[in-house]
Amino acid sequence: MELLSILRFPDYSMDGGRLMTALEAKRAADNFNQELFKRTLEKATKYFNKEIEEAACQGSYEFCIKSDNDYLIMALGQKETIELFHSSDLQKEIKKRFRVDGFLVNFEKGYERDYVRVSWREPY
């Protein structure tokens, strides 16, 4: 209820104005969440592809990244990194996207930090 009174604009009538601005606020929040999801998905895909290429050049078949990795945070951004490790929908989408190309992506919860492990069987 407090949120509704904060969002009320004087241009609207009392009841209709509150309802209208609450709906607008919900839409704005939904749009922000969708944009964050898309932005994180694209940045994470690009970052993981770069890491796959680097690991493959060294003859490795997997790599692991910690949630507090400075390079990951710089590449994705703070909000995007948090979204990556806390959004199960985003994790499912990343797993699905990489599975098509033969990569296995696992998100693991640790005691102090989370991890993402990407592995593959054949030489990349």
Q: What name fits each language-model region?
A:
Residues 45, 84-94:
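Well-ordered, non-membrane alpha-helical segments in soluble/globular domains
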Residues 2, 12, 20, 89-91, ...:
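A general, composition-driven signal for non-globular sequence regions
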Residues 50, 91-96, 100:
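A short, charged, amphipathic alpha-helix used as a generic interaction element across diverse proteins
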Residues 97-124:
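C-terminal edge-of-domain segments
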Residues 1-82:
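An N-terminal amphipathic alpha-helical segment
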Residues 64-66, 95, 103:
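A generic structural signal for ordered secondary structure
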Residues 80-88, 109-111:
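Short, charged/polar micro-motifs that form catalytic or ligand-binding hotspots
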